[in-house]
Curated annotation (Swiss-Prot):
GO cellular component terms, semicolon-separated: cytoplasm
Biological processes, Gene Ontology terms: phenylalanyl-tRNA aminoacylation
Cofactor(s) this protein cannot do without: Mg(2+)
Gene Ontology molecular-function annotations: ATP binding; catalytic activity, acting on a protein; magnesium ion binding; phenylalanine-tRNA ligase activity; transferase activity; tRNA binding
Database matches in Pfam families: Phe_tRNA-synt_N (PF02912), tRNA-synt_2d (PF01409)
Details of cofactor binding: Binds 2 magnesium ions per tetramer.
UniProt family annotation: Belongs to the class-II aminoacyl-tRNA synthetase family. Phe-tRNA synthetase alpha subunit type 1 subfamily.
Class of enzymatic activity (EC top level): ligase
Protein name: Phenylalanine--tRNA ligase alpha subunit
Cellular location(s): Cytoplasm
Length: 339
């Protein structure tokens, strides 16, 4: 039995030395040490030995097992080293070759414009206020003095989730929520995303960005509104920019105006960008309607205020002479890297 075990050990070591891969070494392990392996079969024959022989043979068998296991571990390490060396040779790297560079991102022109707008108004004493994009009909229309039959309430203009919940069409609801929670004086801007049921084209998208401003205090006049907007426009577009106020109508302001500026491309002389008029419509503004103040719990006999709103997307287009609003949302780095 002892001679048989020694012979089995030598045979196993020969098979281990002949193995050239981890798979072949695993087969050797199963062949000799597995449940049906040769060493296991020899040990099963120990029942025929005498009581005196069994301890001696058992000790020798354990030594043989240890020798085979040790030889297997050493061989596995050597085989893995050879496999790694072979793999590295096949995947050799030329360190003199230039590396692959990743494309570097850049701040989007919309974000650049929005940050600049915030900076200007914060410098004028405004605070930034935010509100939900999923809004109630009350805050988006009712509290802003919009008539029940106002066209902006139609499903052709507004995304309705149900009869009372919509995607906000403007950031004006933020002004209402602020006036409900805060007593005058109030001086805020509310930038954010808005949604309208528009068909995408060169000047319209279903999602767009808007910035609105609100000032409420005692003694606020139309002159304060005019002065605030003129300072903003000249800081954003340059001191040579001229400003023109035209009478208009909005349900939430009275009186109301639309504000035009001289064309950035032709400096007011007339071109394709301004359709030959020399002026570009920039934003809407006016004095806060007394009904809006009342709806928010503010006495219009004591306080007055002004509000204004502008599309950040169109403002960005005007400043950077972009002729198609859809370019802002295509994530084309060739376009974004121009700004």
């Amino acid at each position: 039995m002892e001679a048989k075990l020694k012979q089995l050990e030598e045979k196993a070591k020969q098979d281990i030395q002949a193995s050239t891969s981890t798979d072949s070494l695993e087969k050797v392990r199963v062949k000799y040490l597995g449940k049906k392996g040769e060493l296991t079969e020899v040990l099963r024959g120990m029942g025929s030995l005498s009581k005196e022989e069994r301890p001696l043979v058992g000790k020798i068998a354990n030594l043989v097992r240890e020798q085979i296991e040790e030889a297997l571990e050493l061989a596995k390490g050597a085989v893995k080293d050879k496999e790694l060396e072979s793999k590295l040779k096949m995947e050799s790297l030329d360190v003199t070759m230039p590396g692959k560079t990743r494309e570097i991102g850049k701040r989007h022109p919309l974000i650049q414009a929005m940050d600049e707008l915030k900076s200007i108004f914060i410098g004028m004493g405004f605070k930034v206020a935010e509100g939900p994009e999923v809004e109630t009909v009350h805050y988006n229309f009712d509290a802003l003095n919009a008539a029940p039959n106002h066209p902006s309430r139609d499903m052709s203009d507004t995304f309705y989730i149900n009869d009372h919940i919509i995607l906000r069409t403007q950031t004006s609801p933020v002004q209402v929520r602020t006036m409900e929670l805060q007593k005058p004086p109030i001086r805020i801007i509310s930038p954010g995303r808005c949604f309208r049921n528009d068909t995408p084209d060169a000047t319209h998208t279903p999602m767009f960005h808007q910035l609105e401003g609100l000032v409420v205090d005692k003694g606020i006049t139309l002159g304060d509104l005019k002065g605030t907007l003129e300072v903003f426009i000249k800081q954003f577009f340059g001191n040579d920019t001229k400003v023109k106020f035209r009478p208009h109508h909005f349900p939430f302001t009275e009186p109301s105006a639309e504000v035009d500026v001289t064309c950035f491309k032709c400096a007011g002389h007339g071109c394709s960008m301004c359709k030959g008029e020399g002026w570009i419509e920039l934003l809407g503004a006016g004095m806060v309607h007394p009904n809006v103040l009342r709806n928010c719990g503010i006495d219009p006999e004591i306080y007055s205020g002004f509000a204004f709103g502008m599309g950040i997307d169109r403002l960005t287009m005007a400043k950077y002479e972009i002729d198609d609003i859809r370019l802002l949302f295509e994530n084309d780095m060739r376009f974004i890297n121009q700004f």
